[in-house]
From Swiss-Prot:
It comes from Bacillus subtilis (strain 168). Keywords: Cell membrane, Membrane, Transmembrane, Transmembrane helix. InterPro entries: Caa3-assmbl_CtaG (IPR014108), Caa3_assmbl_CtaG-rel (IPR019108). It is a multi-pass membrane protein. The chain crosses the membrane at residues 11-31, 48-68, 80-100, 119-139, 147-167, 183-203, 254-274. It comes from the Bacteria. The gene is ctaG. This is Protein CtaG. Its main location: membrane. It is found in: Cell membrane. GO terms for cellular component: plasma membrane. Pfam families: Caa3_CtaG (PF09678).
């Protein structure tokens, strides 16, 4: 952490993003308190999910993790895992269903939203674009261009939102996946993400020039370090701040991505499985003839 201080406070803590997220959070809490006595209130569970989403979003994009992600590939993969696997489901769960209905059911939004949240399309788009992003040529291009970097980051985030929507949303007017379908959906999602991680994990050499070439690395650092600070820092290459060998750092990144993915997906699998079992038992109990229920009691 002390080594990162050479890049300055703005690069480490992104105060502008902090202020934006703080303002959004304050607005959310204002409506939470104002609507506490109304039927369409924001529940305590929704508030916790939303606040957690803001916290994880800042941790991924505003804390030193963002700066470290330009220095170490392993930190980059942790950042991606949090941004795309942790924040979207918390954000969906943190906004009440009635508010989602007001947003989604607008005539200009509903057809597009319905298409991109179709389970198969959402799965293929998120995992496909995420995998393409980590093709070395594309990755190095995006990492050194501010426009492409912003575009791809937002694109994958939106696709991650679409991917999580069928699993998490509580909008009754929209189709709900059954418990069994949700279990299959998560397992398919995990399988589709595996090839990209395996390619990185089992590569015999460093894949990304933005972590090996000092000139490209310095160019990539300009995306997160203010221009006035870049001129004051004597940059020699990523090895000045990364003590891990490049190949080991790359392999560690793929492993960290899979570990976080397994934790998140495993948690959802457990929750969905027990919810499904509970519903099936309740359903079976309702369908049993009266004399069977009397016999059991």
């Amino acid at each position: 952490m002390n080594q990162l201080e050479i890049f300055g406070f703005r690069a480490m803590w992104s105060p502008y993003l902090f202020c934006i997220l703080l303002g959004i959070t304050a607005l959310y809490l204002y409506f939470y308190r104002r609507m506490s006595s109304k039927p369409n209130r924001i529940t305590g569970k929704e508030m916790v999910c939303f606040l957690s989403a803001m916290l994880f979003l800042y941790a991924a994009e505003g804390s030193p993790v963002d700066l470290l992600g330009h220095i170490m590939f392993s930190a980059h993969m942790v950042q991606m895992a949090v941004l795309y696997l942790v924040v979207p489901p918390l954000l969906i769960a943190g906004i009440p269903a009635w508010l989602w209905e007001k947003i989604i059911f607008r005539p200009s939004i509903k057809p597009v939203f319905s298409f991109f949240t179709t389970p198969l399309i959402a799965l293929l788009l998120f995992n496909g674009i995420f995998s393409l992003y980590h093709v070395p040529l594309i990755f190095d291009t995006v990492k050194t261009d501010p426009f492409y970097h912003t575009l791809i980051t937002w694109l994958i985030f939106v696709l991650a939102f679409f991917m999580w929507w069928p699993l998490v949303h509580k909008v009754e007017r929209l189709r709900q996946l059954s418990g069994l379908m949700k279990l299959g959906y998560i397992m398919a999602d995990g399988m589709l993400l595996t090839p990209a991680c395996a390619l990185i994990m089992f590569s015999g050499a460093p894949l990304y020039a933005t972590y090996t070439d000092p000139a490209l690395w310095a160019e990539a650092m300009r995306l997160c370090v203010p221009a006035d600070m870049m001129g004051q820092v004597p940059l020699t290459g990523p090895e000045m701040l990364n003590t891990l060998p490049l190949l080991e750092d790359q392999q560690l990144g793929a492993v960290m991505m899979k570990i976080i993915q397994e934790i998140v997906y495993g948690t959802f699998l457990a929750v969905i499985f027990f919810q499904w079992v509970k519903k099936e038992r309740e359903k079976d109990g309702q369908e049993e003839p009266p004399y069977i229920q009397q016999t059991i009691s």
